[in-house]
Amino acid sequence: MKLIVKVFPEITIKSPPVRKKFIRQLGKNIRTVLRELDADIVVGGVWDNLEVETRLTDPKVLQGIRERLSCMPGIANFLQVAEYPLGDLDDVVAKCELHYADLLPGKMFSVRCKRAGRHDFSSMDVEKYVGSKLRMQCGAAGIELKKPDLVVRMEIRDQRLFVVHDQHQGMGGYPLGALEQTLVLMSGGFDSTVAAYQIMRRGLMAHFCFFNLGGRAHELGVMEVAHFIWKKYGSSQRVLFVSVPFEEVLGEILQKVDNSHMGVVLKRMMLRAASAVADRLEIDVLVTGEAISQVASQTLPNLSLIDAATDKLVLRPLVATHKQDIVDLATEIGTADFARHMPEYCGVISVNPKTNAKRNRVEYEEKQFDMAILEQALERAKLVSIDRVIDDLSRNVDIEEVSQALAGQVILDIRHPDAQEDQPLQVPGVEIQTLPFYALNSRFKALDDTRQYLLYCDKGVMSRLHAHHLLSEGHANVRVYRPS
């Protein structure tokens, strides 16, 4: 399979050195991400396009390549093509006929040709000649330039002809690694996950910073969604997941700060802590998922007060986005199900919160706060490479594993729904239920507690983690299923 990758249009208007830098970085990213699927993948480049070629023919691998390219920042779109040496125009007709003859009968169609190099014909000459011949030879209903049923696409570059099979949409944006790094404050809800995606889509590397207010289950949930976002949209770069224990900070706020100012003070403490983490990582930009007036702490006066707690630039990609649009985008990018089952703690600590907090009052409230507690939280912060975050969580987790399921037991397939659909689990004589890992903790208590459940995932890592959590919650009817 051969693909022609079209770069983000804004890259093409950069100066030659910058343009080369960005395209070189994009090629590097493509090799990094696709090497998992094909160790011999070939990626070559020209001035405004990259060519990707694999000799593998496994449909699942080829689909995986297309899916990964469609989720890679820096790509406007990519074409699946068949390449031939350029002959005369009759030869071009013959090559197009090979690919479109079965599709054209009864269709209104057009021909589109893009050309680069020196030739004795123009792109329009090709379109007219090929269109006329295909109409006569393939039983097409006619030619329609404005709203055709089918478009015959090709590209000619010097002495190479590319007949286009299909076109796939990319994310746009700049290649990750070509621009600056950011630190995204992650709660795991709709807003923070979509904000992280928007930043990555534009081409900024996103490290993840989580303030743990809710214990192990919340931390696990945020790690899972952060890993999902990175794996799907940013795995060309290695980034960090930072977890800061904030329970004691929250406790100090609850004890010392006036109830109506708790939300603003908590956000200011988070920005202070995030700034310290960013300094450690040499990052100048923080990212949050706040939108104007979505909650009391996000009014313009309060956002201004919150920003005053740091000298870092604070980006808010969703600042003017409606909530339903955020939810819709979360559904589109795959984080909505994670968010629906994620506990949200920041919004429940204030009663009658101030929507127009005053600086002098906020500073007075913060004087009651023991800043040593914030320093201690930062000292206990954990930094883990995002690609190892789930493995590190499962380390030293001792859970009973079984290689065979018995009659009466239930296997819970906790894989992502995509994996469940692509490779359904089948164990003769044993009941299998599907319950994605991100919904397991919230829905397990509704299951029949008289039955024994065996958690299953591909590598056993997620199943061990969730089994450990369920056991710690008092559910003794949980094991891990690891077929031999």
Swiss-Prot record:
Pathway: Cofactor biosynthesis; thiamine diphosphate biosynthesis. GO terms for biological process: thiamine biosynthetic process; thiamine diphosphate biosynthetic process; thiazole biosynthetic process; tRNA 4-thiouridine biosynthesis. CDD domains: PPase_ThiI, THUMP_ThiI. SUPFAM superfamilies: Adenine nucleotide alpha hydrolases-like, Rhodanese/Cell cycle control phosphatase, THUMP domain-like. It holds the Pfam family ThiI. Catalyzes the ATP-dependent transfer of a sulfur to tRNA to produce 4-thiouridine in position 8 of tRNAs, which functions as a near-UV photosensor. Also catalyzes the transfer of sulfur to the sulfur carrier protein ThiS, forming ThiS-thiocarboxylate. This is a step in the synthesis of thiazole, in the thiamine biosynthesis pathway. The sulfur is donated as persulfide by IscS. This is tRNA sulfurtransferase. The lineage of its organism: Bacteria, Pseudomonadati, Pseudomonadota, Gammaproteobacteria, Pseudomonadales.
